[in-house]
Amino acid sequence: MKKNVKKVVLAYSGGLDTSVILKWLEDNYKCEVVTFTADIGQNEDLKPIKEKALKLGIKKENIFIKDLREEFVRDYVFPMFRANAVYEGEYLLGTSIARPLISKYLVEIAKKTNADAIAHGATGKGNDQVRFELGAYALNPNIKVIAPWREWDLNSREKLLAYAEKNGIDIAKKKGKSPYSMDANLLHISYEGLVLEDPNHAPEADMWRWTTDPKLAPNESEIIEIEYKNGNPIALNGKNLKPHEMLNELNNLGAKHGIGRLDIVENRFVGMKSRGCYETPGGTIMLKAHRAIESITIDKGAAHLKDELMPKYAELIYNGFWFSPERSMLQALIDKSQEYVNGKVKLELYKGNVIVIGRESKSDTLFNVNFSTFEEDSVYNQKDAEGFIKLNALRFIIAGKNGRKI
């Protein structure tokens, strides 16, 4: 028995899967379909998506395409990078961080159009179904969610193609379309499937679509300077940039120098292990730069606490809990830590490497050469270290005198 749905907002990419879903919703739910397409920097011409939706019978007023690049970077990517968030030590969360923004607009458009449900094209095996739906329920507990991949029997590409042909859905292949399952936005490109399902099979050289092969990158390194204010990058080489402009420029620089390639096996929230390859050129530069400016502006205790909390914060984003109270609590703590993260970082980019070569903060540095110098100084009494060491060694001394062995 299908849910009683009169109108549904579909997260629509214009591809085979979501085009089939569009017709399937009409056929199986007998409902009106509204489409929503987010421009989050996937570098794709979105005009054909609107034309395809019209061709499939969607009313002009029911087609929504929004440029969310600035909001995506400003309100999602930058807060995440203020935390130095990395999942399982390597993954920069490029797919994970985009899902809550899409959920937000699915819910907003549903309210605007008086729709009673939303729908997405995520499969029943992956993390995205969780991310989309947790976000939607957090923002509207009364929303209905339709996930066709968990309902229908179109469980193979052959069946999808047959359904598309039967319903007059254009299935012409895009020129140069990747055979891999891909996700792209302004932060990254991900690749899954095919030969990558064997974790011991090296990716094909032509799989990588964004970054230069590090071996073929320029033989001359390039030095850049990023300026930070309250933990956010605001200027590149002296030029002030908006958040999405900053990430775009860093992407171009990183891609040119072969920076940001990653091949990992990760633990999905739904329980299985999955192999994925990622290109995150600008994000890789930002992470290195942000940690560098933090190194001279954040107090030791605050920095260590932040590093202890980061894996939990990253896991919350990976698992789809962006709109949770615990993520908001952690964000407040993280943002408080960024109050004095102001200054400039110099980096050298060379054949896949991001090398920090300088950092300064004229207003907020905690680095004081008078205390740390190896030369003679007049501010630090080295004799003080003796008592400090004895107090920290006291438990070892007591245990040793009591016959305890390590």
UniProtKB/Swiss-Prot annotation:
Keywords of the record: Amino-acid biosynthesis, Arginine biosynthesis, ATP-binding, Cytoplasm, Ligase, Nucleotide-binding
Binding residue positions for L-citrulline: Y91, S96, N127, R131, S181, S190, E266, Y278
Source organism superkingdom: Bacteria
Binding site for ATP: A11, Y12, S13, G14, G15, L16, D17, T18, S19, A38, G121
Assigned EC number: 6.3.4.5
Primary localization: cytoplasm
Any single GO CC term annotated in Swiss-Prot or TrEMBL for this entry: cytoplasm
InterPro entries reported in the protein's UniProt record: Arginosuc_syn_C, Arginosuc_syn_N, Arginosuc_synth, Arginosuc_synth_CS, Arginosuc_synth_type_1_subfam, AS_cat/multimer_dom_body, Rossmann-like_a/b/a_fold
Binding site for L-aspartate: T123, N127, D128
Any single Pfam family the record assigns to this protein: Arginosuc_synth
Pathway(s) annotated for this protein in UniProt: Amino-acid biosynthesis; L-arginine biosynthesis; L-arginine from L-ornithine and carbamoyl phosphate: step 2/3
Catalytic activity: L-citrulline + L-aspartate + ATP = 2-(N(omega)-L-arginino)succinate + AMP + diphosphate + H(+)
SUPFAM superfamilies, per database record: Adenine nucleotide alpha hydrolases-like, Argininosuccinate synthetase, C-terminal domain
Location(s) in or outside the cell: Cytoplasm
Gene Ontology MF term list: argininosuccinate synthase activity; ATP binding
A biological process from GO: argininosuccinate metabolic process
PANTHER family for this protein: ARGININOSUCCINATE SYNTHASE
Subunit structure: Homotetramer.
NCBIfam families, sorted: argG (TIGR00032), PRK00509.1 (NF001770)
Family stated for the protein in its record: Belongs to the argininosuccinate synthase family. Type 1 subfamily.
Designated name of the protein: Argininosuccinate synthase
Species this protein is from: Campylobacter hominis (strain ATCC BAA-381 / DSM 21671 / CCUG 45161 / LMG 19568 / NCTC 13146 / CH001A)
Gene giving rise to this polypeptide: argG
